Amino acid sequence: MTSQFASLWQQSLEILKQELKPASFDTWLKNTQLVTIQNGEAHIGVPNDLARDWLENRYATLVKNALSVVLGESVEVRFFTPSADSRRSEPSRRPVATEESSPPLLNPKYTFDTFVVGNSNRFAHAAALAVAEAPAKAYNPLFVYGGVGLGKTHLMQAIGHFVIEQHPQSRVVYVSSEKFTNELINAIRDDKTVEFRNRYRNIDVLLIDDIQFLAGKERTQEEFFHTFNALHESSKQIIISSDRPPKEIPTLEDRLRSRFEWGLITDINPPDLETRIAILRKKAILENLDVPNEVMVFIANIIQSNIRELEGALNRVIAYANLSGKSLTSEVAEEALKNIIPSHRAKVITIALIQEIVAEHYNMRVEDFKAKKRTRDVAFPRQIAMYLSREMLDVSLPKIGEEFGGRDHTTVIHAHEKITKDIEKDPQLEMTIQVLKEKIQRA
């Protein structure tokens, strides 16, 4: 390692020290080195295969971000064991990991403290917290499903962190169904199925991610069925995640499906605008980023699919601003995201857009919202438009009032309170509000 690479790596390690617990840093990163950087890829030497696999699976993004900050440009990372590279072509017979040989693969950032709760995930969060506080006594199993990047893994691992923090002697295992399958295949090949079963049946909490990948794998389903039974009969907690509910997983054995339904099934939906903004704010706070509110609102309006893409967009905007030497503004954010924003992308939601959609729905003119008319056929839609402006936008009450003919902020408060109460009493109005929100988001 040249002195230049040594210096770059030392600076990167200083950043990583702030991100990780001392024990994690000392175990996985202390004895690593930056060997070279070629074609935008940093080659990082690690002491053994276990460290390489651990870093690749759990800390690659953290290391990449730290090194990119030091270099001032984006870089990919590759971990390798120098002594192993020369024998890479030889077949490897790795032992099946045991609970003593490796701790649970939990991302240090995935805790309840960093999980942003909103309408889309409130029930799932409450269920996860209940399970964490009383393993095997609240809901067992807990089955969490939802689309990609919505926080299922975060919530699962938060349970693991909480249990370990409250009960340090607890044996917690987190594994993806793909890794479970691969370990089973290796165990059968190496005649180590006893060790494999000990690994997964002599534990207190099992967190298994993406269970839908067991579909069609009869031997793996058979093994997991017996693992599930062994744990459940011993009053051990099982938490499962999937991209769909049990009944919709194809070629899943009925006996497994029925067991997944023994406990509680809860879903996580895409976050609404308010939650997306809150997620970006939380990320900015946790990473000490100075991001103007207008930029976060812009990104939250553009990226509506999932949290992973939302946070990725913020990273892209910040990197673009830093590398181009520009200040963070919504205009710069639009420049940074121009390649990932569809040409037919939705308009940025504004008060004017909300007024336009509501006016069209009630067959009236936008100008009527700003007029002094107080008849119900005008006042009620106006109140709905004010309500939606308050719910869907992060703007001040005076600003909303100003856009509705210079009305006082107390008028906006009254409108919001009235519509909120009306929704509670009128299911039809609740449905109308939801339809209007969807129209606005698709506009």
UniProtKB/Swiss-Prot annotation:
Domain text: Domain I is involved in oligomerization and binding regulators, domain II is flexibile and of varying length in different bacteria, domain III forms the AAA+ region, while domain IV binds dsDNA.
Protein name: Chromosomal replication initiator protein DnaA
Alphabetized NCBIfam families for the sequence: DnaA, PRK14086.1
Domain of life, source organism: Bacteria
Segments of this protein annotated with the region Domain III, AAA+ region: 105-321
Organism from which the protein derives: Heliobacterium modesticaldum (strain ATCC 51547 / Ice1)
Location of the protein in the cell: Cytoplasm
Binding site for ATP: 149, 151-153
Subunit structure: Oligomerizes as a right-handed, spiral filament on DNA at oriC.
Region (Domain IV, binds dsDNA): 322-443
Region (Domain II): 80-104
GO cellular component: cytoplasm; plasma membrane
One function term, GO molecular function aspect: DNA replication origin binding
Region (Domain I, interacts with DnaA modulators): 1-80
